[in-house]
Amino acid sequence: MTELYPLTPPGPSRRSTLRAAGGGTLLLGLGLAGCRSAVSDSSSAPQGASAASQRGGVLNVAVNADFTPALLFAQSGQSLQHRLIYNTLTRYDDRLRPKPELAASWTYAKDGRSITLRLRDDVTFHNGRKFSADDVIFAVKNLQNPVRAAQLRSTAATVTGFEKRGDHELVLKLAHPVNNLFDLFEFMIITDSETVEDAVTGKKLIGTGPFKLKKWSPGSGLSLTRNDRYWQAGRPYLDGVELRVIAQADALISSLRSGQSQLSFDVPGKSLGAVKNDPRLAITNYDTGAGAVYLGVNTTVAPLNDRTVRQALAWAVDRDRLLDQTLGGYGLASAAPWPKSSPAFTEANRTHYTHNPGKARQLLKSAGHTKLELPLLHLALPGDTAIAESIQYDLRQVGVHVTLQPTDGATAQKKLISQGMPALWTMGHGFAQVQPSTLAVSAYPFNEAKNTSKYRSAEYTKVVQEAWTEPETDTAAANALHEKISSILLDEAFLIDLVVRGRVQVTADRVHGVTLNKFSYLNLDHAYLV
């Protein structure tokens, strides 16, 4: 057996903070190259370390879209509440090393066909029921249920057997080895099995997390209150959290500036320049690529069934302009989905497609087209609309005229899951920030078995399956498979990546200790107000 925990302490965080100081900003280059990311001057300590932790207060979080209960297990665009109400089995540090949460320790079999989890024995659900191995079994089976539309369902499905060794030790038996099991453990929220059907309608959200649901007001947001029986002693510091829906960008920014809201991840890129000049607000860039911007292509709609036409679109978009003018400079212009923190990243793949409208027109002409008219679906939110308009402008320059289709988030997510997208769409994707294999076996836009673009390829499936089951210890073989996946994605262009970016966090200067997990679940265990 191979013991995977305890591990060495985590290294420096890949997050970095940019704090406004009057009318100017001091940038110290501690971020990843190509990402707009820095720390403040030496007089400011990192968030969470600048003052003594204080108990009490309610944190108001401004979000631009409401929680969608039906997508609780699918990871929608608004998943902040997941780690507030629930816990996961493990959590990654910034080097993708798993750390304990509800699983206190674990032992992986040498053949990769089973893992033994030793669970915490001091955890209770919000309704007073004790957490046990049965809850982990339920959580895995719940994600295996196709009704839940979980993007990590394929990984959950590799668990084919369970062996309980008492209430707090569990062996998961796998159909075959996979190298992204801890991605599943970070993604999979542990819900109360007795009320799960009420959870997906928003009636009851019962977990083991630091906050309990007080009220969900559809269209207005979530009201959470402190869990006084939380298993982490003395946590959380906050008395409560309010997730307030503020759909209009100007109103959201005004809420932050006035102090009505103290935290948001939804300030549009175009507005970040104004925000960073406010000395009362700080910008933190999570630059490990949890939310890349892309142009999706339905490969069953003519002439997009022609790879040459899809490649023309990839050459047509000005990624650098999109990044600078629409996203506020936060991110990395990239033709490939990988952040620089990923083992799959290469500079050659990042720059495989650059802005070349002449080449785009030439490819379209070679395919017999000088003018195309296509629909382009996008989320009906200010930041997403600006992205769609930027893409629309670039495509028009090469003779591709698109009609924008603004769509609410819940409807767009359902279309993404059901393969119901029109010819073109633009949204954001995650899953490139964890194990590279997870992107191609889990994320709806990339899934080798069933993706939104309706692209199928025996070669793609073969390479993805090999990458998924390749032991992490064989770095050279794993990297070779990652390169094959990247080559197929770039050559086939059924999904056209534009900018790799993480979540951009705006906080009031009185907020400390805010973090996100790899799937953008908000963690406020150690957060406090001063």
Named regions from a protein language model:
Residues 328-366, 383-386, 473:
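Structural transition elements
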Residues 300-341, 386-387, 489-494:
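Periplasmic-binding protein-like
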Residues 229-274, 401:
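Ligand-site clamp/hinge motif
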Residues 62-110, 141, 206-207:
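N-terminal lobe/hinge region of extracytoplasmic solute-binding protein
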Residues 185-236, 240:
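Gly/Pro-rich hinge or "lid" segments in bacterial periplasmic/extracellular proteins
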